[in-house]
Each structure stands twice: as structure tokens, then as C-alpha cells.
């Protein structure tokens, strides 16, 4: 078996504290770079545990379409700012942060008081702007989870009239790209490859730790295959994933792509999962740019579709 190594050749931290790491993995046998890159990318984008704001309580407010006296931002803006917080919670339980502020004040993430188990990655993230003579009181709920969790309108928690639920994005990795480079030809004429991988995180974890965690998950996934035991099982009907239930509107597609998909009777991610890349291109007025836009939007929530139709 060919021995390879992984080297981090670049590491950058942006103003918003997001981190970008570039790694070079090799030498690999021909075809192994694609296998490794696709496997790592899928786990990195949708399989890692992260922290997210799941609900916000604002004093005197009982629905998200309200405005707050003396606060420049409306409730929807404040909820969006809270949703975009990069947070790292080491607690397996619900953590609650609190803010009591008086104007004039530009409220930032660092002004929210959490326990020592919660770290706010980008403390300069704006939350709200309070005018003189006015107050703002917030209660922010933070949980750990995996992937994307939409609000369950039927749950008991959502029945609290003043607790505003948020669709939670627990994914600490924002983007993964990889390329494959040909290296020297080995003895016997076999080509070698190197995998170059770029990993961008929200700052709640480092690219190094993200790759290590993804690799450990893949090891746990494949380890049972080393000792295969044949067991007859009764097949179960798979339950639809939360991601499949996301409506088309929440993918934030361009107007052109959105309208074309709507005309093709595509209303949710579940509908898109029945398409291949080739199928998308056959939609009327749907070009490669729109198809690439859909692919990128699906990959942000950990879903990929095949390049071509499955041959019979």
C-alpha cells in the first residue's frame, strides 16, 4: 500500500475570524485522490457537529414581524444577526446567553453574556443599534447539532409565544474545494496523484481539526466492513431527511433559476434530489450557470446530485 502524507501549506484568518486552510495530500495512486477528496468533502460539509443559535427571546416581543421602539433594526434583522453568529459551545446541553443594554449603544456579539462553556468567535459581529433613552433585553439559546435543523412548528417549544425559533445551521465548515495534480510517474509506468484541498470554516473550529474529525468519521464508517457478517434484515422505509424538506425559497437562488424551477414543478429540495446535472440542463431556459448555482446551494446543506442519469 502506498504511504502518503498530508501537509498544510497555507492558513489564513479573515476579519470575521473565519479560517481557511490549504492542504496537500500525496502521493496517491491514480483514482485515490478523487475517492479521498469526495469522501472528505461530503463529511466536512454535512457530517461535523457544530453550535448554532436556535431561538431568541426579546422582551416585549411575541412575533418576528414586530419592531422594537428605539432600536434601528427590526426583529427579523436581529434574528438574522443572531443566526449568523459563529459560536463554539462545549456543552452538550442547551446554553442560554443574556443581554441587557441601554442606548445609545451599538450592540455587538461580545455584549451577550454566556457561560464559560460558550465562545463567541467573532465578537465584533453587530446585533442591534439602540437609541438614547431606550433599552433592549435579549435571551439567546445555543445548542449543538449536525447539519441543518428547520423549525418544527408543531413542537412544544414553539408554543411559547415569546420564544422566536430559528432554523439552525450547525455546519462549522463553510466551503470545501479540491483539485487533483499529477505527480511523477512511478516505476512500472503508474501515474501518481496529489490531492490539494482548501477548507474554509466559520472559526468555531480550525481546518486542521475539521479534516481530522472528518477522517475519524470515515474510519468509523468503513471499519465494520473489515469483518463483514451476513445478517438478514427486514428493510425499513427511510424517513425523509430534514434537508429534503427545505422549500425552494430558502436556497436563495437567483430569480431566473427560481422561476425556471418553479415552472418545472420543483418546490423543495426533495424535488431537486430526483434530478441529475444533465436533467437540470434540460429544463427550459435553464443554462449551466443556473445549474451550477443549484449545485452550490445544495452542497451548502450537505446534499449532492449525480452528474448524469443512471444508466440502465
From Swiss-Prot:
EC numbers for this chain: 2.7.7.6
Annotated region (Alpha N-terminal domain (alpha-NTD)), positions in chain: 1-229
Top EC class, one word: transferase
Sequence intervals crossing the membrane: none
GO molecular-function terms, A-Z: DNA binding; DNA-directed RNA polymerase activity; protein dimerization activity
UniProt record, GO biological process: DNA-templated transcription
Keyword annotations of the record: DNA-directed RNA polymerase, Nucleotidyltransferase, Transcription, Transferase
Keyword Transport: no
Alpha C-terminal domain (alpha-CTD): annotated segments: 241-312
Any single Gene Ontology cellular-component annotation: DNA-directed RNA polymerase complex
Catalyzed chemical reaction(s): RNA(n) + a ribonucleoside 5'-triphosphate = RNA(n+1) + diphosphate
Cysteine disulfide partners in this protein: none
Magnesium as UniProt keyword: no
SUPFAM superfamilies: C-terminal domain of RNA polymerase alpha subunit (SSF47789), Insert subdomain of RNA polymerase alpha subunit (SSF56553), RBP11-like subunits of RNA polymerase (SSF55257)
Domain note: The N-terminal domain is essential for RNAP assembly and basal transcription, whereas the C-terminal domain is involved in interaction with transcriptional regulators and with upstream promoter elements.
Subunit structure: In cyanobacteria the RNAP catalytic core is composed of 2 alpha, 1 beta, 1 beta', 1 gamma and 1 omega subunit. When a sigma factor is associated with the core the holoenzyme is formed, which can initiate transcription.
HAMAP family attached to this UniProt entry: RNApol_bact_RpoA (MF_00059)
Family recorded in the similarity comment: Belongs to the RNA polymerase alpha chain family.
Function: DNA-dependent RNA polymerase catalyzes the transcription of DNA into RNA using the four ribonucleoside triphosphates as substrates.
NCBIfam families (UniProt xref): PRK05182.2-2 (NF003516), PRK05182.2-5 (NF003519), rpoA (TIGR02027)
Protein name per UniProt: DNA-directed RNA polymerase subunit alpha
Lineage: Bacteria, Bacillati, Cyanobacteriota, Cyanophyceae, Synechococcales
